Amino acid sequence: GSRRKLKAIKLKEGDSIVSAFPTNGYKLVAIGTSLGNCLVTSVKTINPTGRNTIGVLGIKLPKNSYVVSARPIMESTQYILSLTRQGYGKLTKLEEYVPQNRNTVGHKTIALSNGDSLVSCLPVEGNEELTIISTHNQLKVRCADISTSARNTRGSSLISLRANQYVVGIEVSN
């Protein structure tokens, strides 16, 4: 039989979907931007809209920045793991991210060096095994081996990269 295509969201020119997840059971969401900000906001502030609509603004974006991640925060979450394109990362205690309203810039989550950008703000418990994905390889790391530091610090190098290599993402390993 023929399959009907359903439009999930109306996108403006140049927009793309970064993440999608069910919100049932989650109270908070972490939204990260390329310039190193992370907004923790209540799922309740993101009102349901119809399928063929643009939706609501999650995070206010400064010029030349874009959303890199949007992840649910579970009750068991203890930290936000910030990871950059150049492989720097760290854990920051969740309580350092006071929940704010949507359509605000959030908190500076990591200090970026020239040319670096945030790849992900990943809510974690602190005992997970993670996979860092670069343009050339993957590296498994234990969350427990990543240093904890305040929000606006650089963190430490989590993966060795050669020229023209960069981090594209991080996921919790199964």
Where do the protein language model's features map onto the residues?
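Short, structured "edge-of-domain" segments at secondary-structure transitions
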Residues: 1-174
